[in-house]
């Protein structure tokens, strides 16, 4: 059997199993085992039965709807390649729209950037790499409440200035030392409505804690918007991803705080409504106003 024949058979098996990107996945799995790029597969001479046996096994796993990224162990996201696997949300191409927006913004020379619900560290690490490629500095903080996700994030953030904080973004008094200090805040929080029907790769393999955002998908988004109102300095910038059914709800939520201007609904690379951006305006909220922390309250300490 030739490699081309093996890939043809794999693509047919994956298509029969309901994998939309059957041919692409079959080629990527072959390239992964071959240790080469997908475009260089025609130049690869497989070593024999041992290679084809491993290829058959990994294709069978993909046919069982194990995510491609779990089988390969990595995913490309903007300028970086991230380690991913069981227990962490796999970054999606649609989130690169937030990355593109964020990298186009004018920021101070050494901005403070926060990635809330960082997961694998995708946005935080990609923003750090983007600025490093331009010779620019930043202080970047990634926040997540999952130990497993943070294990991946630490691996992905190695060699970057990204700081990781273990904390729950729904905690009302979270990190008050950031109040009024942040120049850019981005977030891809859990936002899928609880009753949504998902593909097997997502439903069976992504952690549910990283997917579902309550009955309407807005529970964690609401908490993140509250944090943005506190943490961003006047003029600070905000972007939050949402389900493609909740764009209007997210715009209304951000606008209703009366703390933001230039609230805009934006689309992902496929043209679907995907995230909302805004600018923090005016004075910082007083204690107890719009989710601000009353100094008489007990200060919450996040485990770093």
From Swiss-Prot:
GO terms, molecular function: nucleic acid binding; protein-(glutamine-N5) methyltransferase activity; protein-glutamine N-methyltransferase activity
Binding site for S-adenosyl-L-methionine: 144, 188
Known catalytic reactions: L-glutaminyl-[peptide chain release factor] + S-adenosyl-L-methionine = N(5)-methyl-L-glutaminyl-[peptide chain release factor] + S-adenosyl-L-homocysteine + H(+)
UniProt binding sites for substrate: 188-191
One BP term from GO: methylation
EC primary class: transferase
Superkingdom, natural source: Bacteria
Stored InterPro entries: DNA_methylase_N6_adenine_CS, HemK-like, Methyltransf_25, N5-glutamine_MTase, PrmC_N, RF_methyltr_PrmC, SAM-dependent_MTases_sf
CDD domains in UniProt: AdoMet_MTases
Pfam family of the protein (one): Methyltransf_25
Keyword Aminoacyl-tRNA synthetase: no
E.C. no: 2.1.1.297
Assigned protein family: Belongs to the protein N5-glutamine methyltransferase family. PrmC subfamily.
Stated name of the protein: Release factor glutamine methyltransferase
Native source organism of the sequence: Mycobacterium tuberculosis (strain CDC 1551 / Oshkosh)
